[in-house]
Every structure is written in C-alpha cells, then in structure tokens.
C-alpha cells in the first residue's frame, strides 16, 4: 500500500462567498460521501443505479469542468475529490440549482480516499486537471503525480479504463509523461507517443481560455490501462 506523508496541497484560509457557504450548509449532505464510513464504497449503492461507469476527478477546484461533464454525460457517475471548501461549496450549489444527480463529492485527501474507499477495478477513469505544479525544484517531491501514486491508480481502474491529466506547466507535463510512460500497465492513447489533443470531453475553463489568449500552452495526456 502506498504510504504518502507529504501532502500535494496546502490548506489556506480563504474567503467563502455566501453562495458557497449555502452549498456547504444546506446541500452538501445531499452529495457527500463520508470518508469515515467503515467499508469501501459501493458505487451502485451510492449513486442509486447499476451498470453506470464511475469516473473520479481529483482536485476539481471550483468544479467547473466536473459540473459540465456531469451535465453532458448523465449516463456516467462522477466522484469529485477536493479539500478546499470554497470549491466544494461552489460545485454543490451548482448541482443543487440544476438538479444534477450523477455527482458525489468527498472532502478529504485524495491519496487516503483512493487507498481505503475505492475498490480495485471499479473505475472507468480518473481525471486530474491542472494539479499544483510545485514548480520550484525543491518542492517537486510534493507533486501529486509520482510513480507510486500512478501504480495505486492503476489498481483502481478497470482494464481499458483511462487516466487523463492536463497541465499548463510544461515542466510538469514532461514529468507526467515520463511517469505514465514508465508504467507497464498503461499505454499512451497517442500511438506515436507524446501528448494528446484536448479531448472534446474536457471542457475549456475560463482560466484556460484566458491562458490561450496570452499564448500559454496546455498539455493533455491520456493513458489507457491494458
């Protein structure tokens, strides 16, 4: 089992809007999966339906992409993992407003969630969009995407399932590509290797659109479990 003691995130006290606080206070209980439940989650039970693919998004931020993907793919289950309360409140408020029923959230460290709550071979895919690049070299050990972490993810994903990462930090993109390419249980969706075009399934965020206008690059990587 992976034993990760170095956190890939820092919890800071940030401002929470009235709407985000409403989401946390009034509607989070409708969507939250509790980490302290005694056994791994049964997704058929938690989502109230059988035979639906379950996709995990790690670090969903303000929930923009997760919300759009859930709305566009009602046949899929989405589980979002996030530790920052403002983003959780924002997503939950949107889910409530639009009555989206195919999303669940867990407010906890993603590594611990994956270690203890996600059954093996239960996921259709995992998506990690714009993780903290920890760009200073002395902080690289804090990067979420490391070989040991990917080895754990592979166990949770079923055969033919995917890992989809996106980053706007080229050095981190190169690191992710090396890590994923080194995992023997995965193959690159790009037959010639390297990065993938942005899949239509990943929505463009306002942040990304602004970056494109400024000439910033974004690198997508999609690997499939053999």
UniProtKB/Swiss-Prot annotation:
The record lists S-adenosyl-L-methionine as bound by 57, 82, 109, 132
List the PROSITE patterns: SAM_MT_TRMB
Which Pfam family, any one, appears in the UniProt record?
Answer: Methyltransf_4
Q: Which UniProt keywords apply?
A: Methyltransferase, S-adenosyl-L-methionine, Transferase, tRNA processing
Q: Which residues take part in binding substrate?
A: 136, 168, 205-208
What are its E.C. numbers? 2.1.1.33
Q: Which reaction does it catalyse?
A: guanosine(46) in tRNA + S-adenosyl-L-methionine = N(7)-methylguanosine(46) in tRNA + S-adenosyl-L-homocysteine
Listed InterPro entries: SAM-dependent_MTases_sf, tRNA_(Gua-N-7)_MeTrfase_Trmb, tRNA_methyltr_TrmB_bact
Q: Which GO terms describe its molecular function?
A: tRNA (guanine(46)-N7)-methyltransferase activity
Which pathway or pathways does this protein act in? Answer: tRNA modification; N(7)-methylguanine-tRNA biosynthesis
Instruction: Give the highest taxon in the source lineage.
Output: Bacteria
GO cellular-component terms in the record?
A: tRNA methyltransferase complex
Summarizing the function annotation, the protein's role is: Catalyzes the formation of N(7)-methylguanine at position 46 (m7G46) in tRNA.
PANTHER family from the UniProt entry: 3-DEOXY-D-MANNO-OCTULOSONIC-ACID TRANSFERASE/TRNA GUANINE-N 7 - -METHYLTRANSFERASE, PENTACOTRIPEPTIDE-REPEAT REGION OF PRORP DOMAIN-CONTAINING PROTEIN
Spell out the family assignment given in the record's similarity comment: Belongs to the class I-like SAM-binding methyltransferase superfamily. TrmB family.
The name of this protein is tRNA (guanine-N(7)-)-methyltransferase
Please name the gene that encodes this protein.
trmB
């Amino acid at each position: 089992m992976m034993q990760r003691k170095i956190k890939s995130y820092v919890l800071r006290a940030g401002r929470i809007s009235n709407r985000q606080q409403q989401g946390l206070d009034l509607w989070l209980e409708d969507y939250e999966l509790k980490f302290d439940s005694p056994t791994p989650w049964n997704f058929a039970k938690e989502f109230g339906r059988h035979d639906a693919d379950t996709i995990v998004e790690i670090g969903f931020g303000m929930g923009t992409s997760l919300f759009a993907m859930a709305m566009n793919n009602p046949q899929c289950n989405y589980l979002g993992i996030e530790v920052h309360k403002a983003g959780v409140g924002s997503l939950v408020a949107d889910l409530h407003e639009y009555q989206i029923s195919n999303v669940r959230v867990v407010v906890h460290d993603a590594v611990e969630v994956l270690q203890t709550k996600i059954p093996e071979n239960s996921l259709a895919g995992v998506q990690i969009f714009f993780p903290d690049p920890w760009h200073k070299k002395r902080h690289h050990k804090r990067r979420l995407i490391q070989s040991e972490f990917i080895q754990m993810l592979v166990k949770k994903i079923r055969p033919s399932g995917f890992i989809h990462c996106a980053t706007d930090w080229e050095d981190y993109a190169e690191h992710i590509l090396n890590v994923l390419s080194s995992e023997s249980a995965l193959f690159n969706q790009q037959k010639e290797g390297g990065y993938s075009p942005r899949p239509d399934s990943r929505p463009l965020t306002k942040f990304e659109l602004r970056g494109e206008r400024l000439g910033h690059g974004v690198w997508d990587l999609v690997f499939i479990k053999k």
